C-alpha cells in the first residue's frame, strides 16, 4: 500500500511537471511566432537566392576594384556559383569571417586624404544583400531632413530644402564638420542602435563581424576598433542609422536640420539662436555619439554669405525676385581648373579624345549643378572654353603650311590665311583672331564633338 501511494505521488508530480512544461512550451512557441510575424527571419531573407543574385548584379553594375584577394567581379561569379552554399552554411552557423578591407587613399580638395576600405567582391555582394533587406526597415524611420544615400533623394533636394527654409526666415546656419566621420563610428553605440530595429540577432552579429574585419595597409592587417570604412556597400546605411539619432533629437527640438551623409546644416532665425545651436549640437555629437566636431571648420554663418556658406558645393543668393540657388565660388574654381587641365595644349595632341573627355566631365557637372542660377557664368566659361579649343586646334596644325591649307579650306582668303599662318604671335593670341574664330566657329566645333555648355545648361536648368 505504501508503495502504491509512493508511486501514485511520483506519478502525480510527474504529471504536474509535464503539464507545466507543456503550458510553458506553448507560451514560448506563441511568443516566438508573434516575434517572427513582427519581423520575418531576416537572415534567411538576406541569403535568399533571388536577393543574393540581385546583390551580385548591383555590385557588378557598380564595378570597382578587387579587395585583398585580388578577385575581380568577373572571377567572382563562377566562384559564387561553386561556393555559395558553403558560404551561406558558414553564415548560418556563425562561422563566416569577412576578409579585411584593402586600404586606398584618395586625395581631397583641401589637401588631405580620404581613406577608403575596399572589401573583396564576395564581401561586397554579402553587404549589398544585407543592405537590400535593411533599407525597407529603416527608410520609414529616417528623418525627413536626411538626404544622403537614400532612394529618390539627392543633394539637389537638400539644397532646395535649405532654400525653402531661408524663404521662411531661417537665414542663419550652423554648418557642422565632422572629423573622419566614417572612420570614428563607435561600434558599441552602432550595434545597440541596430538592435532597436533589427530583431534577428544573427544579422546584428554578422554586421558586427564586418565592422571588426580589419584593414590591410602596406601588407599588414590592422584591427578596426571603430569606424565603418567608406567603400563598403553597407557603410552608407550604417552611417545614416548612426546619425539618425542626431536628426531625431533636433527634430524633437523643432530645429530645421538638413543632412547629407556627414554634411550637416542646422537653421535658425537669428545669429544668437544659431550660436546656441552650434554649442548644443556640438555637445550632443561629442558626448552622446562620441564623434569629433572639427571646431575650426564648424561655424555659424548667414546663408547668404558669399564665401562662407557652402553646402554640398552650393550656396544661396537673393535679389529682387527672391532667393535662388547658386554654385559656390570654390566649386566654380574647381570646375574651371579641371576644364583648363582637360583642354591644355599638352592634352590636345588629338582633339577628338580631348573633346570627349570634356563632354563627359562637363555633362556630369551640369547634371549635378544644373539646378543653380548661373547663366552669365556659364556663358563666360563657354566662351573661354571655345577659345581654348581653338588654341588646341591651332597648335595641332603645327606647321605654317598646314595652318595655311586648313584656313583656306575653311573659307579664309589666301592672302589673309598666309599672314595668319606665318604669324609669330602666341597660340592664345592667334586663336582669338577674327579669321580663326570665323574658321573655327561654334557650329563647326559642335559638329566636331564640342559640348556647348550654354545649350546644355539651358536644357538641364529648364527642369527647375
Language model feature labels by segment:
Residues 1-81:
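Non-catalytic, polymerase-adjacent accessory regions of viral genome-replication enzymes
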Residues 47-52, 100-102, 109, 349-369:
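Core structural elements
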Residues 66, 70-110:
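Phosphate/adenylate-binding "loop-and-lid" substructures adjacent to NTP/NAD/dNTP-binding pockets
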Residues 90-105, 109, 141-303, 308:
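Conserved polymerase palm-domain catalytic core
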Residues 212, 288-356, 361-363:
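A conserved non-catalytic segment of reverse transcriptases
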Residues 223-226, 324, 340-353, 365-377, ...:
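Short, solvent-exposed helix-loop connector elements
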Residues 297-306, 357-361, 378-386, 401-410:
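A glycine-rich phosphate-binding loop feature that marks nucleotide/adenosyl-phosphate handling sites
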Residues 388, 397-464:
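Extended C-terminal regions of large enzymes
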Amino acid at each position: 500500500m505504501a508503495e502504491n501511494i509512493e508511486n501514485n505521488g511520483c506519478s502525480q508530480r510527474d504529471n504536474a511537471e509535464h503539464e507545466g512544461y507543456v503550458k510553458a512550451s506553448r507560451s514560448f512557441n506563441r511568443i516566438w511566432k508573434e516575434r517572427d510575424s513582427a519581423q520575418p527571419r531576416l537572415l534567411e531573407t538576406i541569403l535568399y537566392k533571388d536577393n543574393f543574385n540581385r546583390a551580385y548584379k548591383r555590385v557588378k553594375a557598380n564595378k570597382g576594384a578587387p579587395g585583398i584577394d585580388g578577385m575581380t567581379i568577373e572571377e567572382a561569379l563562377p566562384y559564387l556559383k561553386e561556393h555559395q552554399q558553403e558560404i551561406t552554411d558558414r553564415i548560418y552557423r556563425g562561422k563566416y569571417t569577412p576578409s579585411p578591407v584593402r586600404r586606398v587613399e584618395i586625395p581631397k580638395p583641401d589637401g588631405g586624404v580620404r581613406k577608403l576600405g575596399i572589401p573583396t567582391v564576395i564581401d561586397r555582394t554579402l553587404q549589398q544583400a544585407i543592405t537590400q533587406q535593411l533599407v525597407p526597415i529603416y527608410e520609414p524611420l529616417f528623418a525627413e531632413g536626411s538626404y544622403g544615400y537614400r532612394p529618390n533623394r539627392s543633394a539637389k533636394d537638400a539644397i532646395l530644402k535649405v532654400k525653402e527654409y531661408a524663404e521662411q526666415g531661417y537665414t542663419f546656419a550652423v554648418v557642422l564638420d565632422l572629423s573622419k566621420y566614417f572612420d570614428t563610428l563607435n561600434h558599441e553605440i552602432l550595434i545597440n542602435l541596430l538592435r532597436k530595429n533589427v530583431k534577428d540577432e544573427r544579422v546584428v552579429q554578422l554586421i558586427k563581424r564586418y565592422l571588426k574585419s580589419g584593414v590591410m595597409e602596406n601588407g599588414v592587417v590592422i584591427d578596426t576598433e571603430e569606424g565603418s570604412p567608406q567603400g563598403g556597400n553597407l557603410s552608407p546605411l550604417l552611417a545614416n542609422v548612426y546619425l539618425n539619432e542626431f536628426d531625431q533629437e533636433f527634430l524633437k527640438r523643432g530645429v530645421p536640420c538638413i543632412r547629407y551623409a556627414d554634411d550637416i546644416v542646422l537653421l535658425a532665425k537669428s545669429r544668437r539662436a544659431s550660436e546656441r545651436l552650434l554649442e548644443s549640437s556640438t555637445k550632443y555629437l561629442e558626448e552622446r555619439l562620441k564623434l569629433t566636431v572639427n571646431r575650426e571648420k564648424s561655424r555659424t554663418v548667414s546663408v547668404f554669405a558669399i564665401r562662407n556658406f557652402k553646402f554640398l558645393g552650393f550656396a544661396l543668393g537673393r535679389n529682387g525676385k527672391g532667393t535662388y540657388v547658386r554654385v559656390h565660388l570654390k566649386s566654380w574654381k574647381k570646375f574651371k581648373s579641371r576644364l583648363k587641365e582637360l583642354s591644355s595644349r599638352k592634352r590636345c595632341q588629338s582633339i577628338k579624345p580631348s573633346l570627349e573627355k570634356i563632354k563627359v566631365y562637363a555633362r556630369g557637372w551640369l547634371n549635378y549643378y544644373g539646378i543653380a542660377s548661373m547663366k552669365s557664368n556659364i556663358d563666360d566659361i563657354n566662351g573661354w572654353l571655345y577659345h581654348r579649343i581653338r588654341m588646341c586646334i591651332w597648335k595641332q596644325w603645327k606647321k605654317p603650311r598646314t595652318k595655311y591649307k586648313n584656313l583656306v579650306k575653311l573659307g579664309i582668303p589666301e592672302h589673309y590665311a598666309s599672314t595668319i599662318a606665318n604669324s609669330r604671335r602666341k597660340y592664345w593670341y592667334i586663336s582669338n583672331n577674327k579669321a580663326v574664330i570665323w574658321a573655327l566657329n561654334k557650329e563647326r566645333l559642335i559638329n566636331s564633338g564640342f559640348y556647348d555648355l550654354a545649350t546644355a545648361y539651358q536644357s538641364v536648368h529648364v527642369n527647375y
